[in-house]
């Protein structure tokens, strides 16, 4: 076995059972990985020097093909309603077949870290079949100092073999694609998909399982820090403005997707960003755009023209086009990946029903209720001629990555909010003046002004009213913001239509929350919107 690159010789990939490998490349940097990628015909270069790869049939994650090993250790700690079980026997068989499939191949190894907090990190070794996957994960996770590599010992291992095709009958899986997570032994096997995001989310899944047992809250969120050291956390599902609103030139970006909250404050799990690029422009998002114009960035499923110029408006391969780059490609990014205890938590929603106010203040119990609900609304595709919005509830703002029961994360969040006296806000970046198709999108200028007032503390001094449907506190007047949009009902021409729409959304919240009723106390139950409606 030919081995190249700095690594701990006492912890080679042979310790994972990988033998009879043609060649192993450890911890190669970007330039070497570019050479290997092009030599192997895996990707091409853009005119500006980014590496451009296509992922084939899988242009997004495959949540239905993800399995968690069910054993004595995980039996009582994993939320099996949301995680598909795999038997220990099936996993061992799959693992043996992965080892067999890797024989004779060239493999790429990156020894990386998940978690910027030394007390709460995990050494994650990622072994990949493709050179471009090695660069992708090197960009996304935290890279140890060069001198630390010779003594690096992995605590978690991901083996990523896109050319492996799973036999559904043999392993009890659904398709040829498989993501098998062994939380007890900290091994992840990824096969039958070239979508690189699966590797990143596997580390997130592991930390989401490990950290709550240590009293540390894992979060699917972005985070930034103000000039006075005040940290803000932004929860939100895809399309709610999480990346856009946390990328503020006046504040330091801690990270854009995955963080932990522990005794020392907020810390990033990652060392890079994985940003959507569909319809990306230099005018709207200059910092993200700039990363796509340089060497070292990986562009995923972005279409190039004959001159190798990226066309970010072309969604012919997928709408889920992405770029992966190290955090230090962003000028105002944190070098430490850490921030203090948060002063504000923002829960973002894009309410396409046009019912919710642009901002509301939440009590700790309401924050837990809305965190467990994880609400946003998607707008149906116009090609189907459907104008009715579709409510989406993804608990903890990231259900696919949460191995434990949501109430564990919810209780931990509520405890930390109370302990550190954090102000919590619900911010609606969706529709005002009517539902989607009638109303208009909430003006981004208004959202930014409300957010700025929340973050600098001035919004706490405003006069508030209690929303009759949701029971949270809504400011009556905020300097620089049109007062009319603060009361969503007043923006609707047809008040009866608003009331009917509000009741419809409230009912959706209530129905969705039924599965959590037995896991929460009376305070959180009382934070439900239906209580207010019933009382009137």
Swiss-Prot record:
The keyword Transferase does not apply. It catalyses: oxaloacetate + ATP = phosphoenolpyruvate + ADP + CO2. Mn(2+) binds at residues 201, 220, 257. Its EC number is 4.1.1.49. Substrate binds at residues 61, 195, 201, 322. Pfam families: PEPCK_ATP. It is found in: Cytoplasm. Binds 1 Mn(2+) ion per subunit. One of its GO terms (biological process) is gluconeogenesis. Its main location: cytoplasm. Involved in the gluconeogenesis. Catalyzes the conversion of oxaloacetate (OAA) to phosphoenolpyruvate (PEP) through direct phosphoryl transfer between the nucleoside triphosphate and OAA. ATP binds at residues 201, 220, 236-244, 285, 322, 447. It comes from Brucella anthropi (strain ATCC 49188 / DSM 6882 / CCUG 24695 / JCM 21032 / LMG 3331 / NBRC 15819 / NCTC 12168 / Alc 37) (Ochrobactrum anthropi). It is an enzyme of class 4 (lyase). This is Phosphoenolpyruvate carboxykinase (ATP). InterPro entries: PEP_carboxykinase_ATP (IPR001272), PEP_carboxykinase_C (IPR013035), PEP_carboxykinase_N (IPR008210), PEPCK_ATP_CS (IPR015994). Its cofactor is Mn(2+). Pathway: Carbohydrate biosynthesis; gluconeogenesis. Belongs to the phosphoenolpyruvate carboxykinase (ATP) family. CDD domains: PEPCK_ATP (cd00484). It comes from the Bacteria. Keywords: ATP-binding, Cytoplasm, Decarboxylase, Gluconeogenesis, Lyase, Manganese, Metal-binding, Nucleotide-binding. GO terms for molecular function: ATP binding; metal ion binding; phosphoenolpyruvate carboxykinase (ATP) activity.
